[in-house]
Amino acid sequence: MEPMAASCPDWLATHLHQAGGAVPFSRFMDLALNEPEHGYYGSGRARIGAQGDFVTSPSLGSDFAALLSPQILAWLTSMSRSDPDQRLSIVEIGPGEGHLARDLVAALRGADPELLARIELVLVEANPGMRRRHQALLQEADDLPLRWCSLEELGSAPVHGVVIAHELLDALPVERLSWREGSLQQQWVELNPNGGLQTTHRPLPNGLHQEIKRVCSQGGIQLPPPDAEEGWTTEWNSALPDWFAAAAAAVDAGVLLVIDYALEAQRYFTARRSDLSLIHI
């Protein structure tokens, strides 16, 4: 499918002008999602749940938390026995509306209220609007210490406990790579002469080229696939290593639990899977 032109809001046009008129797709995606005033997540306008823009397992009911809570309880109990005086933390990175945090607290309260009394809840969420929604949803857990912080702040003062990230990795900005004229190219988003958005393609920067080469060698994959046709396009998440390093740095002692859904790389990076994951401009 060939990309088509799309309208561009003034705030985004300002960012593009400041960048010289064009940015890599990853930067465009970051702005669209996380720009503090206008981004989908950054502005706090995202709505998750049956009546919202999309659903996650926790937004549909408490079953997901009920299945997770026995394992989390076992981890926290083990840590509690190892160091009875240590304050423990349950951290959720990217908590959405707060459904999972609320339901986990309720499940743990029912299973071991004495242990829960030693636990604080930490939500990694920068947006003030989302924080207010968390407060409203978590009113029943007002006996539990609750705080918000950034991942960088956690890295400076790592916790003892369990750090959870659920359906977060697929919201990290990605590069879009396209096979054109015999080479793998990086997709950019630019302003056209009419002030709208359109895509263009540029040679891979050396750093991105070396990263792809290294990961493909380690994972036994080939980009592009041998039978890829002209215009074959896929996504590439360069943000993953730095994100995992930052998330791991948030844990002084405990467990980092990351839950997401995807195909194995060998099944994902195939010729028939082109332009499937993102609706592009």
Regions found by a protein language model. Give the residues of each.
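Conserved small/polar residues in nucleotide/adenosyl-binding loops
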Residues: 279-281
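A short SAM/SAH-binding and catalytic strip from SAM-dependent methyltransferases
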Residues: 159-178, 238
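A short glycine-rich, Lys/Arg-flanked "PGG" loop and its adjoining helix->strand segment in the class I
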Residues: 179, 245-252
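A short, charged helix-loop
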Residues: 192-235
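Rossmann-like AdoMet
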Residues: 1-93, 97-160, 177
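Short phosphate-coordinating micro-motif centered on Lys-Gly-acidic
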Residues: 161, 178-204
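Short, well-ordered beta-to-alpha junction loops that form the rim of enzyme active sites
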Residues: 168, 259-263
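Conserved beta-strand signature within the Rossmann-like core of class I S-adenosyl-L-methionine
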Residues: 188, 254-259
